[in-house]
């Protein structure tokens, strides 16, 4: 993530406050259901990271506030995590679409789930409908395909220089399938691009 010069100077807070709808670290923290702490002089407050993004490049951040911390619960036994992105270049490129998925598996079923997606809305966002779909299911090909379809229907991307809205929806579906492939070795097929 990032070139060597950027990794030497950049901060996690800067990445989040940049408010990019496709920031890689933001996707990671959203999938981990992180909380953000803000400080202004002696005044402190915290809120879920998912509530920090109000609109395109708009944050719940007052003019003199600084990000003091970002935290999330330490994943326990049975926790799995994966991050995926599609970009034109393999390294050092801004994503067209990116996504992260955090799961907790118990007794062969998905006990908790949290997914995030970027490039598919004006803000980086969680995918609560997809997470709800996953809870209680076995991690198999049918579940992977259902999660991918749910994610695709849950987003409202716009067409821009990085791709059409339909293409971004397609990419998100493919990346959700990739999560299952990486975490469980599941080959769930691919989606075909929709044509009008």
Give each language-model segment a name:
Residues 1-196:
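C-terminal structural segment of proteins
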């Amino acid at each position: 993530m990032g070139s060597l010069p950027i990794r030497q100077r950049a901060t996690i807070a800067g990445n989040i406050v940049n408010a990019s709808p496709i920031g890689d670290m933001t996707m990671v923290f959203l999938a981990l259901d992180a909380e953000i702490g803000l400080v202004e002089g002696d005044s402190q407050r915290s809120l879920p990271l998912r509530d920090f993004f109000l609109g395109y490049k708009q944050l719940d951040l007052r003019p003199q506030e600084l990000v003091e911390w970002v935290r999330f619960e330490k994943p326990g036994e049975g926790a799995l995590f994966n991050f995926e992105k599609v970009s034109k270049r393999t390294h050092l490129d801004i994503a067209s679409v990116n996504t992260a998925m955090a799961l907790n598996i118990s007794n062969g079923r998905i006990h908790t789930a949290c997914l995030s997606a970027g490039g598919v809305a004006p803000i980086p966002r969680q995918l609560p409908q997809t997470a709800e779909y996953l809870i209680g299911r076995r991690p198999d090909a049918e579940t992977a395909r259902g999660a991918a379809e749910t994610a695709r229907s849950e987003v409202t991307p716009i067409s821009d220089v990085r791709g059409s809205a339909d293409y971004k929806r397609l990419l998100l579906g493919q990346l959700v399938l990739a999560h299952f492939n990486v975490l469980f070795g599941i080959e769930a097929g691919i989606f075909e691009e929709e044509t009008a």
